[in-house]
Structure formats: C-alpha cells, structure tokens
UniProtKB/Swiss-Prot annotation:
<dbReference type="GO" id="GO:0005829">
    <property type="term" value="C:cytosol"/>
</dbReference>
<dbReference type="InterPro" id="IPR035570">
    <property type="entry name" value="UPF0234_N"/>
</dbReference>
<protein>
    <recommendedName>
        <fullName>Nucleotide-binding protein C8J_0350</fullName>
    </recommendedName>
</protein>
<dbReference type="Pfam" id="PF04461">
    <property type="entry name" value="DUF520"/>
</dbReference>
<dbReference type="InterPro" id="IPR007551">
    <property type="entry name" value="DUF520"/>
</dbReference>
<comment type="similarity">
    <text>Belongs to the YajQ family.</text>
</comment>
<comment type="function">
    <text>Nucleotide-binding protein.</text>
</comment>
<dbReference type="GO" id="GO:0000166">
    <property type="term" value="F:nucleotide binding"/>
</dbReference>
<dbReference type="InterPro" id="IPR036183">
    <property type="entry name" value="YajQ-like_sf"/>
</dbReference>
<keyword id="KW-0547">Nucleotide-binding</keyword>
<dbReference type="InterPro" id="IPR035571">
    <property type="entry name" value="UPF0234-like_C"/>
</dbReference>
Amino acid sequence: MASEHSFDISAALDKQELKNAFEQAKKELDSRYDLKGIKCEIDLSEKESIFKLSSSSEGKLDVLKDIVISKLIKRGINPNAIKELSRESGAMFRLNLKANDAIDSENAKKINKAIKDSKLKVNSSIRGEEIRVAAKQIDDLQAVMKLVKELDLELNISFKNLK
C-alpha cells in the first residue's frame, strides 16, 4: 500500500467527444424544420477547439448556439467551459465559441487557494495546466474532489491519475 496517494486536476477536453457533439449538431441542423430555407452552417476547428457558427438570420444564430451547447451537454462536456469569442454581422452573422481545454493560471490559483483554505491535510501544487494533489488518506482526496466540483469554475474539470 502506498504511503501517499495523489491525483491530478485537469480541464482537458476529450477531442473525440467534441467532434461527436459537432457531428450531432450538424445532423440536427440538417433536419430542423425551423431552419429550412435559412443558410446556416456549423464548423469545428479541432486544433483550437473553436465552433464557428454562421447564419443569414441573427435570431437563428442563438438557435445554433443552443443546438451546439445541448449536444455538448449530452456528450458530458460542461457548458460553462464554452466561451463566446466574437459575434460578427454583415451579409452573414457569425459567432465563434471556444471550448476551454486548459486550466489557466488564474483558475489554478483559485483552485489551489480553495484547497489550502479547506484545512484538509493535503498538499497541492500547480504543474503547468494541471494541479497535483497529494495526501496520506484517500478520504482527504475525495473531499478535495468534492470541494473542487462545488467551485463555480468555467472549466470542464476532470480528475486523473488517482494513485
């Protein structure tokens, strides 16, 4: 039995689930009756995790956004992890949505501070885009998991490498 247990807190997105949500949203876009006759498109830039929505009607842009977010929820991706980057108008209305797939330094500090303030007997350290949490008892690690889930973060939090 190990003398110290640990796990990593990460915000990594499953790229395959992102792609599956995109494919499902595209399929729904083709079959929706209220979108017939209106030029609408959904594209995914997998490298940057950006959804590019475009429509000839500004009102239908929000419908496209709702479709994408509902499909992401069904695929297990936290809707709070989706940020609206830009909204453009012209001949076509465009909207870019970014899926946050990393813990930035501000959120890492917020998580680390919450763990330290909880007075649990754990050690936490920021390691790039992950936070390593270590403790002698697994119960303390489970308490930290619960604490982090209850924080109101706009990330898709996941726990990996529980040892």
